[in-house]
Regions:
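Mature, function-bearing regions of proteins
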Residues: 1-222, 226-278
Length: 278
């Protein structure tokens, strides 16, 4: 197994200093990964999104025609398809339309209400903390740099990300044919296309970065909208209740699941997020 050089060595990650000691107290356990966790990090940097990658393999057999079929089912529903649904798409849509056993709709609804109560503070945190921190994170910004998304389309990308966030945080914004649900799956689809494109590019260095848009980087992006936001609102003097924070993380756990992140990287508590960020 390749160990991308961007990942610090296991020994280096065991270093103890004031920062790690502080996090150990906050997390109530060592923030440094044990060896099993470290190996999982190595693997995550080399793993994509198996479910949607299968769809992309099928789409590329007839890019224009197959993409039209995928988008029709995604945005209109499978009942609108006149011909039999291809096996690859049937398997994928069966998977994403069947909600995970752990999903609690009440917590989703509570998280949406909490998000709305934050009002304009959402914009400050997402713009000045979550997105800016994300753009400073090398694993996140390398695909953006190589595809030109930061240089040529930064404003468009910011607008699209904001629109997506607004859509998913609407009441029932994650129901099957809602704009939030469909745009989330479409982003997942685009991620897979970019991953396929960059994997073939001479400009992408697997030995340094792992594969493009890998599981770890997707999980870090999800944390920028969940754990980092909770830190940001506290910095503004807004202290959520334990239940509000729990529901908020649950909401983003489901969004991350829809986005193709494996469940082992979807946090259920803030300390889990802090350890993963470390």
């Amino acid at each position: 197994m390749i160990s991308p050089t961007r990942l610090a060595s296991f020994n280096d990650m065991q270093d103890s200093n004031f920062f790690t000691q502080f996090l150990n107290i906050c997390c109530e356990k060592p923030v440094q990964p044990n060896y099993k966790e470290y190996v999982s990090l190595q693997r995550a940097l080399c793993e994509g999104d198996v479910e949607i990658d299968k769809v992309i393999d099928w789409v590329m057999q007839d890019p224009k025609g197959h993409r039209m079929i995928f988008e029709k089912i995604l945005f209109q529903g499978r009942d609108e398809l006149s011909e039999p649904i291809p096996t690859e798409l049937e398997n994928f849509f069966n998977y994403i339309e069947q909600k995970p056993d752990w999903l609690d709709q009440q917590q989703i609804d509570e998280a949406v209400k909490f998000t709305h109560r934050l009002g304009i503070n959402n914009g400050f945190i997402l713009r000045d903390l979550s997105l800016m921190a994300g753009y400073l994170y090398p694993g996140f910004n390398q695909p953006l740099i190589l595809t030109g998304a930061l240089k040529k389309e930064a404003g468009t990308r910011l607008a699209e990300t904001t629109k997506w966030w607004v859509d998913i945080t609407e009441p029932h914004g994650l129901s099957r044919l809602s704009a939030g649900f469909t745009s989330t799956i479409y982003v997942r689809f685009i991620h897979a296309l970019v991953r396929r494109q960059l994997k073939k590019s001479d400009r992408w260095d697997n030995e340094v970065w792992g594969i493009p848009l890998n599981q770890f980087d997707l999980a870090m992006t999800n944390l920028a909208f969940s754990s980092v936001v909770l830190l940001g609102i506290r910095a503004l003097g807004i202290w959520p209740t334990k239940q509000e924070a729990k529901s908020f993380l649950h909401f983003w756990r489901y969004v991350g699941w829809l986005m193709g992140i494996e469940e082992k990287w979807l946090i259920q508590s803030e300390p889990e997020g802090w350890r993963l960020l470390y």
